[in-house]
Amino acid sequence: METNILMESGTNELEVLEFTVGNNHYGINVAKIKEIVPFHVVTPVPNSHPNVEGIFMPRDMMITVVDLAKVINAKPSPDIKKDMFIITNFNQLNVAFHVHTVIGIHRVSWADIIKPDSTVNAENDGVSTGVIKLEDKLVIILDFE
């Protein structure tokens, strides 16, 4: 498998899934992704965090859905039926991130990731771990952990 080489020490590369929320491009390390599924109607959870859209149960597994547009203060999707859920697993917890489009996967060198400074990303509460320049656009790498 091609992805396994990225786990070996010394490759100095990672694969990043590019997606959009609003008009901006974002990325997440592919190693953190469990699967990508089309938008599902979710069940709201009373008294949950405002960024939690609700829950859904594909294949009898309950997954919390986080509305990434709310998290990053972006506009809602213009066509929710075309949206996607990026399902991740962090600390044995399955979480789906509601995004507007999924663009594709890019293999990048760690050296190509530009670290954000403190004016862009507060050290303790920022979700951006870096920025990658791809062709004519900037892709902001998000860390959901």
Give residue ranges: language-model regions.
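An acidic, low-aromatic, low-complexity terminal/linker signal
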Residues: 1-145
